[in-house]
Amino acid sequence: MNKSLVAVGVIVALGVVWTGGAWYTGKKIETHLEDMVAQANAQLKLTAPESNLEVSYQNYHRGVFSSQLQLLVKPIAGKENPWIKSGQSVIFNESVDHGPFPLAQLKKLNLIPSMASIQTTLVNNEVSKPLFDMAKGETPFEINSRIGYSGDSSSDISLKPLNYEQKDEKVAFSGGEFQLNADRDGKAISLSGEAQSGRIDAVNEYNQKVQLTFNNLKTDGSSTLASFGERVGNQKLSLEKMTISVEGKELALLEGMEISGKSDLVNDGKTINSQLDYSLNSLKVQNQDLGSGKLTLKVGQIDGEAWHQFSQQYNAQTQALLAQPEIANNPELYQEKVTEAFFSALPLMLKGDPVITIAPLSWKNSQGESALNLSLFLKDPATTKEAPQTLAQEVDRSVKSLDAKLTIPVDMATEFMTQVAKLEGYQEDQAKKLAKQQVEGASAMGQMFRLTTLQDNTITTSLQYANGQITLNGQKMSLEDFVGMFAMPALNVPAVPAIPQQ
């Protein structure tokens, strides 16, 4: 048989397979749209219930090799959102290349069969216009996603450079590249990426020009949805440099910032152990080197169901605040109410007897390092039925024990206070002299009130508590006696003489 005829037959056969496969995949996507939108709304309700937003779709057009549709994000009917007004929506254009070999993936030489390849861009409308203005009329971002037949997805997110300038306000952003992966149910998610630089110019409440810049922002993390409805996993965020300037003069320079958080499930997935690590390699204020710091905070034995209840109550209360314009439009009042909501829900977290550990919170300069180490064992007050009769009984309802130790090398403290004095305008010699006096005075006062000790040129405080008893720097006393050390003595105010009778 003629080889040319064979080749033509193969090409025709492949075309039939391709067309049939692409059409089937297009129909499959259509049948999954409702489920995908429902899952998106369920995820949105879980992660940001206070947003009062929902996702929907419109203008679906299915073709043989590709389809188009629009996704809308808008306020839930009858509810308010501070960013999107009723009747408004954020709209995304979705261009879908059908599988099993989407054209967009073939352009990247990706030959792995997949259900679809999707390109997402933002529609320019009343809500999104400010972003388009900052991007000089271009789409501010582009997302290219690959959806496998399993339903898992992988997305490349490209944030475009932004520039905005009006009077004394300016925003400049280099753009960034991020990768988002998710399983079909949205339970397992990972995000990584970086942005090179950013700059914000504004005017503060004192009518001063303020500028904030950052360089080399990186993030990398993953999380899964636990059985009790909350996310656990790992997250890392780092920033090479950030500067804050006022009226053209550099006020602060922060270098080498890194935050790492992780949470693990134990006890058959019912309990969470979490850890937060924060480090700052260098802090300079007005060119004065104040040193470096780090913090390791661990919270263990968190009951998963209790955490979920806390999250639900806190989110419900903060969501209710956003529905009250007199609160939502007043930042100070809103923050006050949010804090109240947090502490009102906090007792729920004590179920499971959590343990809080700080080891360490430290600050270091050229002359030494100060450190605070603390362990706090808590317990569920609901397990105690009797009403407390004393202060110790009240504390013991929630606290099993406390162990804390603070160490401050005198030389380190003196160096730190010297830098502070120089910031206040003192010359080097004067600053050292003043700092020495301040540290010696604080140390002497601490010893006088039995709050600190001085040994090996280090100011130290140690405090332990358990069962109503305090041990302060080795001296035992009751909780009431300890509190009495800080009580103000009663002032003998003479009685006001009676007004003489006329």
Swiss-Prot record:
Q: Which GO terms describe its molecular function?
A: identical protein binding; protein homodimerization activity
Q: Which residues form the signal peptide?
A: 1-19
Compartment annotation? Cell inner membrane
InterPro entries from the UniProt entry: DUF945
Looking at the UniProt record for this protein, which Gene Ontology cellular component terms does it annotate, in alphabetical order? plasma membrane
Keywords on record: Cell inner membrane, Cell membrane, Membrane, Signal
Disulfide bond positions: none
Protein origin, superkingdom = Bacteria
The UniProt entry's GO biological process terms, in alphabetical order, are: bacterial-type flagellum-dependent swarming motility
How this chain sits in the membrane, per its record, is: Peripheral membrane protein
Primary place of residence?
membrane
Q: Does the keyword rRNA-binding apply?
A: no
Q: What Pfam families does the record tag this protein with?
A: DUF945
Concerning its family, UniProt says: To E.coli YihF and H.influenzae HI_1236.
The UniProt subunit note reads as follows: Homodimer.
Q: What is this protein called?
A: Protein YdgA
- This chain's source organism reads Escherichia coli (strain K12)
Q: Which gene encodes it?
A: ydgA
